[in-house]
């Protein structure tokens, strides 16, 4: 694995003046068991102006707007009767000591919690130990790697994690494969490391089961005939693949475990790393269903069923040589403003990332770490409590996805064949493909339609805005990315869908003119 690391990352050293060198100690030397600290430039916790924090935690997304009681209830202890979800939730009552109020004090004796004396202090570059332990336990539960020499490091969110992963693998001039439509800010991380992004064609067939994102045959052929197909790269082989394998941004496609296995086998054969960006993967989604159907408590999955049959295993679970690095974030499941995530990979990879972190970011925010860790451990109840929260998020996102897609599917624009809709199996995005007549100047008509959509009052993202190489992807750039995450209510989603399809319908009636 070490041969794939960048020369820049491999050459970094650790350096700190307070590290004592015990080499060549005089005979008979024994370190004092409890020395006094007169070396560290750290203020004593008594100087911190904050004595305690109280965090009030909800049981369910949108709990306040639904007027649900605070009960610290889990999905698995709800009464699974044939009752509508909202009605059942409103009947919940608090029993026993509430765990909806998390108190963070200056000091605690609970080894799983982070107190203010630790959270407000300088801390380890790798992350505060309690949160690090949670990240490792989560990976063991949800995506256990096949080898033992793996570990995690806390990051300042997925963007920071991606920047550090690119630095770990890419030297100037190194080639990295990227899905042709992607989270384009990552291109800046690649550029910062000096890498060369090469787009991989996606299969944008919206028919259910017809596509898993990456066009595998295209990828396979590209690798088999690399020198002939990419002569301008002067026989530089790909060093890595960057992929959003679940709920792909922007398309919404999700790769099955069988598909991932085929891609991983290519990585072994052609010796490249896989950088797996997974901000949305825990938000698995069932196929679209009527949004007006009253869902029952029994529709909730158990944690075991979710892990066994719904959560797609990470590339980590296939990795036998340490070539997979997984980027996780708390942004989509907790809160993005905390700027907190973590990276999973082989210890050699995490070591070079740790050395880079020591230069560019040092440790992540201690306040963010204590909020996330203590809410999960004290209110949710550890790893399974966190997964229980994920299932509640999943349920809410499923309903929202159904509301938005229902508005699209019921439209005249859809029934007339003006558009197709990708039904996502994970995440917070769907893509709507506009079916222009053959020979249409797609970029120009997408530009005009974008103005039409803004004029009717709906903001979406044009597919070509998320292309790695617009000239390469122009034939497949006839889509818009829509999200069901930011809207404040189901009525906003319905109105957004209504405005979108009305603009498309009018655009086609006017002969593809504004």
What are these regions (language model features)?
Residues 77-95, 103, 111, 134, ...:
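Conserved core segment of the aminotransferase class I/II
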Residues 170, 438-448, 490-494:
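Short, conserved charged micro-motifs
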Residues 41-45, 159-160, 182-184, 205, ...:
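Short, solvent-exposed loop/turn segments at secondary-structure junctions
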Residues 390-405, 409, 417-437:
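Conserved glycine-rich beta-strand-loop-beta hairpin in the small C-terminal domain of fold type I
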Residues 2-127, 455:
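N-terminal "arm"/small-domain region of PLP-dependent enzymes with the aminotransferase-like
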Residues 65-271, 275, 281-318, 420, ...:
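Conserved core of the PLP fold type I
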Residues 456, 467-514:
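PLP-dependent enzyme catalytic core of the Aspartate aminotransferase-like
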């Amino acid at each position: 694995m070490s041969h794939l690391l960048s020369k820049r990352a491999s050459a970094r050293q650790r350096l700190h003046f307070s590290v004592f060198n015990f080499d060549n100690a005089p005979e008979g030397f024994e370190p004092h068991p409890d020395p006094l600290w007169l070396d560290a430039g750290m203020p004593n916790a008594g100087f911190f102006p904050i004595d305690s924090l109280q965090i009030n935690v909800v049981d369910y997304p949108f709990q306040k707007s639904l007027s649900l009681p605070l009960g610290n209830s889990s999905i698995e202890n709800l009464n699974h009767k044939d009752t509508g979800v909202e009605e059942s939730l409103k009947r919940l009552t608090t029993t026993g000591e509430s765990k909806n109020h998390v108190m963070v004090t200056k000091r605690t004796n609970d080894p799983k919690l982070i107190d203010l004396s630790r959270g407000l202090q300088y801390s380890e570059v790798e992350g505060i130990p309690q949160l690090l332990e949670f990240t490792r336990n989560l990976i063991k539960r949800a995506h256990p790697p096949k080898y033992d020499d793996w570990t995690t490091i806390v990051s300042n969110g997925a963007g920071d994690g991606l920047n550090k992963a690119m630095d770990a693998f890419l030297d100037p001039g190194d080639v990295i494969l990227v899905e042709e439509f992607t989270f384009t800010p990552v291109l800046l991380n690649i550029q910062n490391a000096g890498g060369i992004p090469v787009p991989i064609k996606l299969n944008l067939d919206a028919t259910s089961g017809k596509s898993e994102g990456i066009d595998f045959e295209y990828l396979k052929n590209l690798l088999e005939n690399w020198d002939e197909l990419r002569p301008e790269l002067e026989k530089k082989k790909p060093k890595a693949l960057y992929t959003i394998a679940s709920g792909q941004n922007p398309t919404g496609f999700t790769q099955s475990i069988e598909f991932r296995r085929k891609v991983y086998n290519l990585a072994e054969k052609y010796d490249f790393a896989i950088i797996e960006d997974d901000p949305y993967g825990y938000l698995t989604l069932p196929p679209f269903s009527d949004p007006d159907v009253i869902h029952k408590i029994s529709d909730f999955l158990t944690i075991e069923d979710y892990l066994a049959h719904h959560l797609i295993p990470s590339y980590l679970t296939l990795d036998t040589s340490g070539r997979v690095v997984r980027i996780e974030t708390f942004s989509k499941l907790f809160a993005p403003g905390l700027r907190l995530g973590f990276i999973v990979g082989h210890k050699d990879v995490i070591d070079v990332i740790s050395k880079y972190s020591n230069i560019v970011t040092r440790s992540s925010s201690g306040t963010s770490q204590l909020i996330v860790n203590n809410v999960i451990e004290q209110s949710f109840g550890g790893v399974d409590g966190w997964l229980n929260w994920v299932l509640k998020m999943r349920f809410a996102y499923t309903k929202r996805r159904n509301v938005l897609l229902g508005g699209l599917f019921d439209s005249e624009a859809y029934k007339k064949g003006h558009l197709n809709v990708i039904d996502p199996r994970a995440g917070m995005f769907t893509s709507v493909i506009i079916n222009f007549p053959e020979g249409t100047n797609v970029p120009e008509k997408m530009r005009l339609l974008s103005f039409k959509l803004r004029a009717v009052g709906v903001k979406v993202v044009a597919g070509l805005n998320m292309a790695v190489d617009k000239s390469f992807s122009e034939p497949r750039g006839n889509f818009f990315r829509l999200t069901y995450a930011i809207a404040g209510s189901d009525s906003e989603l319905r109105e957004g869908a209504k405005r979108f399809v009305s603009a498309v319908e009018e655009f086609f009636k006017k002969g593809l003119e504004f």
